């Protein structure tokens, strides 16, 4: 298939890179995800795609949300600035006139990380903790996509039935407790509210209040992993996303796991491809699909 242009559409940023036949990323760049609606998202995609449309053979897209029938539907529209539905496939085809393959970002990252593991595992899961919480599942060596693209939306499993209302409309989802957005929201009652990134900086400096907020997030992830271990007999979990890859977060998740009986624990490790799992996974999936 030659070279492809991979895009990773997230709640905070849109990343892009050319992916060679050998899997090397070239010219990686990223821009902030626009918050103004469909027109702004289309313009952002054109900015990233247009310079490459005569240099690549296909477009591969990993995107937050539900990817089905060529459309992007946000389970939690707040993660995309309120955008609930977008004709992603038609938009990209109109810009590039190139073959295009779409996949949810968690599913794409899971596919890339599964390849990086080699042939050692049949059942694994990728978890991204970032603006939201998402994931992708490999079961019996196959990526679960689902009939409607919903497979792997683990951030919308239940964490606290009495918790805050999630942007999806359900109360107490894992995303509403553990995401970077939730971490930032936890500080709204502080004398000086701060971002999730600042909470991590404060925790690194020994701030107990900040550490407590991060521990709450890590505990919610550990409990969700326990549920997924029992449902899917997972052998390993790969952790990614800006929160998931933050210094010390993995260790907090592992510490929270240790409070559970052994049968509920599953080995967890950081993403091999770091922040590029979605880009590479989308390209790998596209090559296998076209």
UniProtKB/Swiss-Prot annotation:
Pathway listed for it is: Amino-sugar metabolism; N-acetylneuraminate degradation; D-fructose 6-phosphate from N-acetylneuraminate: step 2/5
Which residues take part in binding Zn(2+)? 156, 166, 168, 173
Gene3D superfamilies, per database record: 3.30.420.40
An example GO BP is:
N-acetylneuraminate catabolic process
GO MF annotation terms: ATP binding; N-acylmannosamine kinase activity; zinc ion binding
Residues bound to ATP are 6-13, 132-139
User: What is the E.C. number?
Assistant: 2.7.1.60
Q: Which Pfam families does this entry report, sorted A to Z?
A: ROK
Q: Which reaction does it catalyse?
A: an N-acyl-D-mannosamine + ATP = an N-acyl-D-mannosamine 6-phosphate + ADP + H(+)
Q: Which InterPro entries match?
A: ATPase_NBD (IPR043129), ManNAc_kinase_bac (IPR023945), ROK (IPR000600), ROK_cs (IPR049874)
Keywords of this protein's UniProt record, alphabetized? ATP-binding, Carbohydrate metabolism, Kinase, Metal-binding, Nucleotide-binding, Transferase, Zinc
What's this chain's function?
Answer: Catalyzes the phosphorylation of N-acetylmannosamine (ManNAc) to ManNAc-6-P.
NCBIfam families, per the entry: PRK05082.1
Q: How does it assemble?
A: Homodimer.
Instruction: State the similarity comment.
Output: Belongs to the ROK (NagC/XylR) family. NanK subfamily.
Query: What is the protein's name according to its record?
Result: N-acetylmannosamine kinase
Q: Which organism is it from?
A: Yersinia pseudotuberculosis serotype O:3 (strain YPIII)
């Amino acid at each position: 298939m030659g070279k492809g242009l991979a895009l990773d559409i997230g709640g905070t940023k849109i990343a892009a890179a050319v992916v060679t036949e050998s899997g090397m990323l070239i010219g990686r760049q990223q821009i902030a995800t626009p918050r103004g609606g469909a027109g702004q998202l289309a313009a952002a995609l054109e900015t990233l795609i247009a310079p490459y449309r005569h240099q690549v053979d296909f477009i591969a897209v990993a995107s937050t949300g539900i990817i089905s029938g060529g459309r992007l539907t946000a389970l939690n529209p707040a993660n995309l600035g309120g955008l609930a539905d977008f004709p992603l496939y038609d938009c990209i085809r109109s810009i590039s006139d190139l073959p295009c393959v779409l996949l949810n970002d968690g599913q794409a990252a899971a596919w890339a990380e599964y390849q990086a593991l080699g042939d050692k595992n049949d059942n694994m899961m990728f978890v991204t903790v970032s603006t939201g919480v998402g994931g992708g599942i490999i079961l019996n060596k196959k990526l679960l996509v689902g009939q409607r693209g919903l497979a792997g939306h683990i951030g919308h499993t239940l964490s606290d039935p009495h918790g805050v209302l999630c942007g999806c409309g359900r109360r107490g989802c894992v995303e509403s407790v553990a995401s970077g957005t939730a971490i930032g929201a936890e500080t709204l009652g502080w004398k000086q509210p701060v971002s999730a990134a600042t909470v991590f900086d404060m925790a690194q400096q020994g701030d107990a209040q900040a550490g407590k907020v991060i521990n709450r997030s890590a505990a919610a992830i550990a409990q969700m992993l326990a549920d997924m271990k029992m449902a899917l007999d997972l052998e390993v979990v790969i952790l990614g996303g800006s929160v998931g890859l933050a210094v010390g977060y993995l260790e907090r998740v592992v510490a929270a796991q240790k409070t559970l009986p052994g049968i509920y624990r599953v080995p967890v490790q950081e993403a091999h491809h770091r922040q590029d799992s979605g880009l590479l996974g989308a390209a790998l999936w596209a090559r296998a699909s076209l």
